[in-house]
Amino acid sequence: MRSPRVLGLVLAGGAGKRLAPLTADRAKPAVPFGGIYRLVDFVLSNLVNGGYLRIAVLTQYKSHSLDRHITTTWRMSNLLGNYVTPVPAQQRLGPQWFAGSADAIHQSLNLVHDEAPDVVVVFGADHVYRMDPRQMVAQHLETGAGVTVAGLRVPRSEGSAFGVIRTADDGVTIAEFLEKPADPPGLPGSPDEIFASMGNYVFTTDVLIDALRADAADPESVHDMGGSIVPMLVEQGTAAVYDFAANQVPGALERDHGYWRDVGTLDSYFDAHMDLCALDPVFNLYNRDWPIYTNVPPSVPPAKFVHDTPGRVGVATDSIVSNGVIISGGAVRRSVLSPGVRVNSWSVVENAVVMDNSVIGRRAVVRDAILDKNVVVPPGATVGVDKEHDRARGYQVSEAGVTVVGKGVTIAD
């Protein structure tokens, strides 16, 4: 029996408004993460590690940096017809942009027809996690479902923040798909948990095509995969759930098994970075059996730490320090530094995410903050120390008190 022919479609058109100002000049999937990665690298690494090597990334909003990252990083050998390619909105069906995630795929059905897959894997582009998609595809084929939805077990008390899956008594068939219900139903045998939709789907190809065409013809539809297509197939009795907790990733540790983060807000984005900095991180970037791939410029030199005199020590603890960083007599604690960052003498960077080529001046303090690329913190200046002062200077402060500074800003007094 031959292996199924699989096409990967990655939904990467999100604007990510809740991540502003980090999305002022880039699409959400292009937002940097973890020092050297982009958010889109996680889903693409999962698909490629799983052996799914024909992938179209559907883009739309401010996609230049995302398109450039994909074309420079994800270059597959085309000897066997493999590819990872960005596909911008092309207005194939008329002079309009994508009206939703389902419309994005409907307008790109030529890709499906050209590839003629048995199965279409439709994954989102802006979550941090590891997953072996082969196991989800195997269950999909075994059950004969039209669509299989990846479900994440979360406490029932948090169900109002998610699309919630109610299963039939068999625990697999989806009986109902509820969008952010006030009183979500618990799981059979585990009433204090619910299945939250992860936004990852596996479709039988002809079922997907028929559903997209029916949805496109419905003027009342919101043309969304979770809001339109999945409920349609639930009603037809052909939808199943895949329990993400059952997914076994090669090389995964017990503590990071089942890790999944939606980093759609500034606070969740910040918290996911802090997850990386722990002594025993709940998400392990160093799994060699299931690597997260990205583009690291070969010309960037290693990190450098200088000065070791009383009161002036270049040091970083509980932190991720990327290539090209120079910590020159400053102290870095529980932070993530991207390539090219410079931390100068007597400065302190604590509980912070500092992106490429930002400069922290002498005796400056950066605390509980996110700095986008090319930010300059002048000598003696502070960021994140006085939240009211940060707001007065025009910097965004999140609900949890994280100060966020946009790209290319020089911090004002």
UniProtKB/Swiss-Prot annotation:
Any one GO MF annotation of this record: ATP binding
EC numbers, comma separated: 2.7.7.27
Biological processes annotated in GO: glycogen biosynthetic process
Catalytic reaction equation(s): alpha-D-glucose 1-phosphate + ATP + H(+) = ADP-alpha-D-glucose + diphosphate
Pathway(s) served: Glycan biosynthesis; glycogen biosynthesis
Enzyme class, first EC level, given as a word: transferase
Residues annotated as binding alpha-D-glucose 1-phosphate: G163, E179, K180, S197
Key words of the record: ATP-binding, Carbohydrate metabolism, Glycogen biosynthesis, Glycogen metabolism, Nucleotide-binding, Nucleotidyltransferase, Transferase
Family: Belongs to the bacterial/plant glucose-1-phosphate adenylyltransferase family.
Subunit note: Homotetramer.
Role played: Involved in the biosynthesis of ADP-glucose, a building block required for the elongation reactions to produce glycogen. Catalyzes the reaction between ATP and alpha-D-glucose 1-phosphate (G1P) to produce pyrophosphate and ADP-Glc.
Record-given protein name: Glucose-1-phosphate adenylyltransferase
Biological source species: Parafrankia sp. (strain EAN1pec)
